[in-house]
C-alpha cells in the first residue's frame, strides 16, 4: 500500500470519517465499517483532503482537461482538489461544478466556474448507486465534453443488486475508469498491520466474502 493511502486512512479515522464497528447501511446491509466524508468539514481538513485527492490523481496518470464536482458534495471537493493540484504539483487545472437549480438571471445556466469542455475528471466522495454519475453524464454530454474518468475517496468494492458493484456498472456503461484514494482491500491491509484495530479483521473479511466483487 502506498504511504498516502495509509496516511489517508489514519486521517479519516482521526476525524471519525471512517469508523469500524456495526452499522446499518441505507441498503439494509449490516456493515463492519462506515465512511462519511461530510465530516471533513473544517478548513484544515478540507485542505488535507484535497492533497490526498491530488496525490491519487497524480498517481493514476489520468489525462484530463477540467475538474468537475457534481452538486452538492462534489463542489467543495473539486475546489480543494484544484487548489491542492496547483500548490503541490504545479498542475493548474480549471474547475467547474453544477447547480441543482437552473438560474435564469445573472450569469444564468446550471454551471459555475470554467467552461465544461474537453476531457472531464469528475471528483466525488463515494459512488453508492451511480445516480450522481449518471446525472453528471447528461451535463457533460450536453456540453459536448467527454468523461475521462472519476476519482472518489473510497471504493467499497461490493456488489449492488447484481454481481457488479455500482462502480463496475459506471465503468461498463460509460467506458471510463473509476479511481479512488483507497478501497476496501486497503482497509483490510491497514487492519492487518494495525494492532489497535485487528479485532475488526474477521468481520471485514466476512463482509468481503459475502458482498465483495469477484
From Swiss-Prot:
CDD domains: PRTases_typeI. GO terms for molecular function: magnesium ion binding; orotate phosphoribosyltransferase activity. It catalyses: orotidine 5'-phosphate + diphosphate = orotate + 5-phospho-alpha-D-ribose 1-diphosphate. GO terms for biological process: 'de novo' pyrimidine nucleobase biosynthetic process; 'de novo' UMP biosynthetic process; pyrimidine ribonucleoside biosynthetic process. One of its GO terms (cellular component) is cytoplasm. Pathway: Pyrimidine metabolism; UMP biosynthesis via de novo pathway; UMP from orotate: step 1/2. Its EC number is 2.4.2.10. Catalyzes the transfer of a ribosyl phosphate group from 5-phosphoribose 1-diphosphate to orotate, leading to the formation of orotidine monophosphate (OMP). NCBIfam families: pyrE (TIGR00336). This is Orotate phosphoribosyltransferase. It comes from Glaesserella parasuis serovar 5 (strain SH0165) (Haemophilus parasuis). The lineage of its organism: Bacteria, Pseudomonadati, Pseudomonadota, Gammaproteobacteria, Pasteurellales.
Amino acid at each position: 500500500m502506498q504511504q498516502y493511502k495509509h496516511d489517508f486512512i489514519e486521517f479519516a479515522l482521526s476525524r471519525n470519517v471512517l469508523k469500524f464497528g456495526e452499522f446499518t447501511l441505507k441498503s439494509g446491509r449490516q456493515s463492519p465499517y462506515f465512511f462519511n466524508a461530510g465530516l471533513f468539514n473544517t478548513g484544515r481538513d478540507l485542505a488535507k483532503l484535497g492533497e490526498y485527492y491530488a496525490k491519487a490523481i497524480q498517481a493514476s496518470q489520468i489525462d484530463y482537461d477540467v475538474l468537475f464536482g457534481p452538486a452538492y458534495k462534489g463542489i467543495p471537493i473539486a475546489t480543494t482538489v484544484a487548489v491542492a493540484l496547483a500548490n503541490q504539483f504545479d498542475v493548474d487545472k480549471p474547475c467547474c461544478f453544477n447547480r441543482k437549480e437552473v438560474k435564469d438571471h445573472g450569469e444564468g445556466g446550471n454551471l459555475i466556474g470554467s467552461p465544461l469542455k474537453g476531457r472531464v475528471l469528475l471528483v466525488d466522495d463515494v459512488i453508492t448507486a451511480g445516480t450522481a454519475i449518471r446525472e453528471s453524464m447528461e451535463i457533460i454530454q450536453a456540453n459536448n465534453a467527454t468523461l475521462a474518468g472519476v476519482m472518489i475517496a473510497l471504493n467499497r468494492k461490493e456488489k449492488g443488486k447484481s454481481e457488479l458493484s455500482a462502480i463496475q456498472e459506471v465503468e461498463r456503461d460509460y467506458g471510463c475508469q473509476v479511481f479512488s484514494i483507497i478501497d476496501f482491500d486497503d482497509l483490510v491491509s491497514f487492519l492487518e498491520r494495525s494492532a489497535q484495530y485487528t479485532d475488526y479483521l474477521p468481520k471485514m473479511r466476512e463482509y468481503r466474502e459475502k458482498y465483495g466483487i469477484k
